[in-house]
Regions:
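DNA major-groove recognition helix of helix-turn-helix/homeodomain DNA-binding modules
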Residues: 47-62
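Conserved hydrophobic/aromatic packing and binding residues within compact polymer-binding modules
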Residues: 9, 23-24, 34-37, 63
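Short amphipathic helical patch at the helix-1/turn junction of helix-turn-helix
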Residues: 3, 14-15, 43
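Recognition helix of helix-turn-helix/homeodomain-like DNA-binding domains
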Residues: 29-42
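Short, charged recognition helix plus adjacent turn
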Residues: 3, 65-67
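N-terminal flexible/basic segments that precede or flank functional cores
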Residues: 1-3, 21, 59
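Short basic helix-loop element that most often maps to the first helix and adjoining turn
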Residues: 7-26, 51
Length: 67
């Protein structure tokens, strides 16, 4: 059974009133990368996932989970 990393990044981002571009700038990636993470097309590295958690003021387990 393959585990797939899912996330709540979009929900947390919109809850904070941030656009994809704003979050991307905060974490040092492109807007396209944020979009790809939100849609599940790209799984972030552990480092990038942690930076996103810090930017969105969330714990890792609040944003990322395996399905």
């Amino acid at each position: 059974m393959e585990l797939i990393l899912k996330n709540n990044v979009k929900e947390a981002r919109t809850e904070m009133g941030l656009s994809q571009s704003q979050l991307a700038e905060m974490v040092g990636v492109s807007r396209n990368t944020i979009s790809s993470i939100e849609t599940g097309q790209f799984s972030p590295t552990a480092k990038l996932a942690l930076v996103i958690c810090i930017a969105l003021d969330k714990k890792f387990e609040e944003l990322f989970y395996f399905d």
